[in-house]
């Protein structure tokens, strides 16, 4: 009954408000592809020094959604297109609204999908520095998958950025089993999902400025702390 009520609430919210900001969608298209599969399509002979794995928000297009392309663009500017792979979470992660109401804020299949990408990155490119991110349901997904990772792989994730973190209250602004100083949570004032609700208000759709500046800056800083400034 509780799951049905929450799913109904999410559906009603979706009908009342857009699930993304049209300006952010336009910017994402202008920056380039909203789908990136560099890790999946790459091979071990062409590994990059940095691999960014990102989970989009509910109902967003591609596998990077509205915020991912901005972060990707900044990372490529910092490290060069030959220095970083960009990988969105697709496959079994459907980014459907109803999955927000599940206990971990997303589906078990989605968590396995993102776990598999981290594991693939570790196997294919064991010397790469990993960074991660997610928005809304994707933030919950990133947190859950990092929490569940083998510690040896989790230790390779230099930094993670979360926007509109739907498990922010429950996880006390952190990712369980992961260092707080490697985590940057962006929660706008008035974003109700950050305070334990699944109601989407306007501030939840306004993380574009963070994705263009503070978030990639945080990730770049964390990578350089590991690999140096080169």
UniProtKB/Swiss-Prot annotation:
Q: Where in the cell is it found?
A: Secreted
Give the consequence of mutating residue 58 to A: Severely decreases activity on p-nitrophenyl butyrate
The identity of this protein, by name, is Cutinase 1
What is stated on temperature in the biophysicochemical properties of this record?
Answer: Optimum temperature is below 30 degrees Celsius. Optimum temperature is 30-40 degrees Celsius.
Keyword Signal in the entry? The reply is yes
Gene name of the encoded protein: CUT1
Query: Which residues would be cut away as propeptide?
Result: 17-31
For this UniProt record, give its keywords in alphabetical order, as a comma-separated list: Disulfide bond, Glycoprotein, Hydrolase, Secreted, Serine esterase, Signal, Virulence
């Amino acid at each position: 009954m509780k799951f049905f009520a929450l799913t109904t609430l999410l559906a009603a919210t979706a009908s009342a408000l857009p699930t993304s900001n049209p300006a952010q969608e336009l910017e994402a298209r202008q920056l380039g592809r909203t789908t990136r599969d560099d890790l999946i399509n790459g091979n071990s002979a062409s590994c990059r020094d940095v691999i960014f794995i990102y989970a989009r928000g509910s109902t967003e297009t591609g596998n990077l959604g509205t915020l991912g392309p901005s972060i990707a663009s900044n990372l490529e500017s910092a490290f060069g297109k030959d220095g970083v792979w960009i990988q969105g979470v697709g496959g079994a992660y459907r980014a459907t609204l109803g999955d927000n109401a599940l206990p971990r804020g997303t589906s078990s299949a989605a968590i396995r999908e993102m776990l598999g990408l981290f594991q693939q990155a570790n196997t294919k490119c064991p010397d790469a520095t990993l960074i991660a991110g997610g928005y809304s349901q994707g933030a919950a997904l990133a947190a859950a998958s990092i929490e569940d990772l083998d510690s040896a792989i989790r230790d390779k994730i230099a930094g993670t950025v979360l926007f509109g973190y739907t498990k922010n209250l429950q996880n006390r602004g952190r990712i369980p089993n992961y260092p707080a100083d490697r985590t940057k949570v962006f929660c706008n004032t008035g974003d109700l999902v950050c305070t334990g609700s699944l109601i989407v208000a306007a501030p939840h759709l306004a993380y574009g400025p963070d994705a263009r500046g503070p978030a990639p800056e945080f990730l770049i800083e964390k990578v350089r702390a590991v690999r140096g400034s080169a």
